[in-house]
Amino acid sequence: MKKFIVNSAILPGNVDPKACAMEAPKMLKNAGVKNAKITSCYCCGPEGRVVFVAEAEARETLLTALNRINVPVASIMETEEVKPKM
């Protein structure tokens, strides 16, 4: 699976960013999504946004999964983790 960074669009006013970040992995599982998973979550309450580190076979697969649980997406970027040399 490929790794992605997902930046949400501004969440609706009634959605708490921290709750969204915490619940999104479970929401994907409960929605029966098996081809995408969220591995890390971050929230920015003042901006009303969340950021996810996710894995999926393709960008479109991940976008479809997030749309299924009503997470508004601003961008999805395929990434490769690079560890700095110490």
Where do the PLM segments sit?
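Short S/T/G/P-rich N-terminal loop/turn motif that feeds into the first structured element of a domain
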Residues: 1-32, 39, 44-48, 81-86
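An amphipathic, aromatic/His-enriched active-site/gating alpha helix that lines ligand/cofactor pockets
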Residues: 31-34, 55-86
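Short hydrophobic/aromatic beta-strand micro-patches
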Residues: 9, 53-55
